[in-house]
Amino acid sequence: MQVFHHIRSLREALAAERRAGKRIGFVPTMGNLHDAHIELVRIAQRNCDVVVTSIFVNPLQFGLNEDWDKYPRTLAADSAKLEAVHCDYLFCPDETEIYPNGMAEQTRVIVPTMIDVLCGASRPGHFEGVTTVVTKLFNIVQPDEAVFGVKDFQQLAVIRRMVQDLCIPVKIVAGDIVREPDGLAMSSRNGFITADERPHVAVLNRVLNGIKQQIEQGSRDFGTLAAEARAHIDAAGFRVDYVSICNSRTLEMAAHDDREITILGAMYTSGARLIDNVSVVLA
């Protein structure tokens, strides 16, 4: 695996791959890699000739009082995991390489309406930071395909919309959620869950699946379903951020005649904010 810290040298290496007719896959991450990240790399490997993984803890997507300074930096371990699955390139720039003029002077990319709801409502500016850095990374790597995890469903929907609106020539591929045996979605932030909390945090996945089952059985009282789910999370001792039943494409509140629905939820433990989602496709 070749490791690059600078845009120019990575571009030169990838230009040679393109001249050789190679199809380039890309997996953008913030590091602290776990099995779900590695599965995204494997998906890219199945679809492409060479794979680039990036590791950059993007300060632009962290708000005030969020955990940018606490976010685990585990580059040596991450590199070893990528080497083990034969990733071709690792791009790990520093902040100056990505934001040479500083973040205050950085041109921003904004996807209207979709970035201000759900996670965007409680994390103002977060998705603006995501779309900006992903646009920059797409321009640097110029991949044929980019793989994102379904766990971050809103992020996936926002990036799909951004790519469509800006005519960026990249195929967005979704990787399924990878879960622990009790249903907890794998996340870099799971390391902040305490030992006392750990047996109970799968409540988020359970209540979302409960809503899914009731929708599949014909219920369309979305407001009541979401309220009951929030009550279950409260009863388990966690603070609810949101439970929402949405149109899978637009992220607007689901209508009774929608056929593709995603149920999204977020809750707080003592040291982490956890998100999850499940989708329903109705006949």
Swiss-Prot record:
Q: Write out the residues that bind beta-alanine.
A: 61
Q: Which segments does the entry list as coiled coil?
A: none
Where's it mainly located? cytoplasm
Any one Gene Ontology MF annotation carried by this entry is: pantoate-beta-alanine ligase activity
Which residue positions are annotated as catalytic?
37 (proton donor)
Where does the record place it? Cytoplasm
GO terms classed as biological process: pantothenate biosynthetic process
Question: Record's Pfam families?
Answer: Pantoate_ligase
HAMAP family cross-referenced by the UniProt entry: PanC
Identification of the protein by name? Pantothenate synthetase
Species whose genome carries this gene: Cellvibrio japonicus (strain Ueda107)
Encoding gene per record: panC
